[in-house]
């Protein structure tokens, strides 16, 4: 991934860590974070299902307009922390 792409993901991760951003987190931004962490996406109607080899957790997201649901933002944040998916980056 290009450096500019990594910088964008770092900024999105900073927003994801903030509880203030849960209600106004763009669905496409949450999707970009998961894809940058090597999750595979499968779409079935309005459900975007993300899986990753080596991780048993399945992430199921449904957009509400252009936003992600707040509880799903929290789930993604906790999944990333629990599995230490950010490598050398600050994961809170």
Report each predicted region and the residues it spans.
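Intrinsically disordered, low-complexity and often Lys/Arg-enriched segments
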Residues: 1-9, 85-92
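N-terminal amphipathic/basic helix or basic patch
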Residues: 7, 11, 25-28
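Short, contiguous pre-domain boundary segments
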Residues: 12-17
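Polyanion-binding surface elements
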Residues: 18-37
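A short, structured beta-strand/loop element
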Residues: 33-59, 64
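Basic, low-complexity intrinsically disordered segments
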Residues: 44, 55-58, 83-88, 92
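C-terminal structural segments of small proteins and small subunits
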Residues: 64-91
């Amino acid at each position: 991934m290009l450096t500019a792409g990594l910088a964008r993901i770092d900024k999105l991760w900073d927003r994801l860590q903030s509880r203030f951003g849960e209600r106004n987190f763009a669905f496409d931004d949450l999707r970009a974070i998961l894809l940058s962490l090597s999750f595979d996406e499968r779409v079935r109607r309005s459900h975007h299902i993300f899986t990753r080899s080596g991780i048993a957790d399945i992430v199921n997201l449904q957009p509400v307009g252009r936003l992600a649901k707040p509880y799903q933002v929290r789930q993604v944040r906790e999944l990333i922390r629990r599995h230490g998916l950010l490598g050398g980056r600050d994961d809170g």
